[in-house]
Amino acid sequence: MKLLNVINFVFLMFVSSSSFAQVIEMNNSPLRDFVTWYSKQSGESVIVSPDVKGTVTVYSSDVKPENLRNFFISVLRANNFDMVGSIPSIIQKYNPNNQDYIDELPSSDNQEYDDNSAPSGGFFVPQNDNVTQTFKINNVRAKDLIRVVELFVKSNTSKSSNVLSIDGSNLLVVSAPKDILDNLPQFLSTVDLPTDQILIEGLIFEVQQGDALDFSFAAGSQRGTVAGGVNTDRLTSVLSSAGGSFGIFNGDVLGLSVRALKTNSHSKILSVPRILTLSGQKGSISVGQNVPFITGRVTGESANVNNPFQTIERQNVGISMSVFPVAMAGGNIVLDITSKADSLSSSTQASDVITNQRSIATTVNLRDGQTLLLGGLTDYKNTSQDSGVPFLSKIPLIGLLFSSRSDSNEESTLYVLVKATIVRAL
């Protein structure tokens, strides 16, 4: 008898707890699934308008029956929907001019973040004394602030908390004690700031060794500083001097240098990349070929197989540039730059493809609008060419009289000009 009483008591406790709390966890679930859940839990008939589409993300471990309707309406309004009428209620897109909306939810004393904060999408869900609220992020991506906000919340409380982002509306959803949420808008105002963009203009070119380029009209009046503190009045002297392959210049050196290179038959422009990227974000551009390289081979003789095969791996071969700029408050730009100029070799000595590689990777500090010169990567090419009179050059001994062979050595040096300009945020 006592055992039966204990079982009944446990059963009543389970039923009681189930009737007073509802658990819901939805991550990017269809809105109609959320409506179906509410209809089953509340027993209320709901009509969904055909234009109601989208997804919702909701986490709550304690929604009491008396708060279920308000909780449901809060989530709808956070996603720009609302309920109209009653028995049955109709869910449709939010229209502030519609007078048939149900009564407003109980007002809360949430602190707003500027003028575009959570009231348009904020809602409260009791969860171990935590409050859940949304915050509108105006200048950066909400997901980029998740780790920063988590650090702020965890450094101010030892209680459990959670921070999520809604990418479509650029919202942060924060579940934390109410006193933490009251201070969060002030903290967000220090990190939700407009981000500058940086325009990277490049010029990748090569010059045959020993040829002097006339950059006098392109950079004759542009004064620069070469590595080591040596001043120069002309870009020409930098390119022509021994080891002079590094310099920083002011003015429009880049644009005028393109014109100078086009008029010289011994120079070759490989690429003129233009990259616009946010400060603190990586940008890259490349052009070339996707070349297959043999990484393994299985033949019938060596492996005793009926179907010999070989494995390949494709790699990009061509011209590429990647940058990672950061705009500083004083107008300086810290720039990580990597530039590559790869090409396929014409050599037939190897059984597979041979590539020629030339690359530069460095980190520099430039002023806004300055142009950086990098270079000194020399490539040596040795070519041999046989020619002769058809048929006669193949005759033994005397065939040498009707044939000739020429050898040539070519040297070319790769240079990279990079100009960085800050595009201020509006």
Swiss-Prot record:
Q: What Pfam families does the entry give?
A: Secretin, Secretin_N, type_II_gspD_N0
| Tagged with keyword Transmembrane | yes
Leader sequence residues: 1-21
Q: Report the locations given in the UniProt record.
A: Host membrane
GO:BP terms for this protein? protein secretion; viral extrusion
| Key words, A-Z | Host membrane, Membrane, Signal, Transmembrane, Transmembrane helix, Viral extrusion, Viral release from host cell
Provide the transmembrane region boundaries: 317-337
What are the annotated GO cellular component locations? host cell membrane; membrane
Give the matching InterPro entries.
Bact_Secretion_Sys_Channel (IPR050810), GspD-like_N0 (IPR049371), GspD/PilQ (IPR001775), NolW-like (IPR005644), NolW-like_sf (IPR038591), T2SS/T3SS_dom (IPR004846), T2SS_GspD_CS (IPR004845)
Q: Could you tell me the superkingdom of the organism this chain comes from?
A: Viruses
> What's its membrane topology?
Single-pass type I membrane protein
User: What is the protein's known function?
Assistant: Acts in the assembly and extrusion of the bacteriophage by forming a channel across the host outer membrane. This channel is just large enough to allow a newly synthesized phage particle to pass through. Extrusion is a process of concomitant assembly and secretion and takes place at specific assembly sites where host inner and outer membranes are in close contacts.
Q: Which family does it belong to?
A: Belongs to the inovirus G4P protein family.
Self-association state and partner proteins as the record states: Homomultimer. The channel is composed of 14 G4P subunits that confer a barrel-like structure. Interacts with G1P; this interaction results in a complex that spans the inner an outer host membranes.
Q: Would you tell me the protein name for this molecule?
A: Virion export protein
In its UniProt entry, the species of origin is given as Enterobacteria phage M13
Instruction: Please spell out the taxonomic lineage of the organism that makes this protein.
Output: Viruses, Monodnaviria, Loebvirae, Hofneiviricota, Faserviricetes
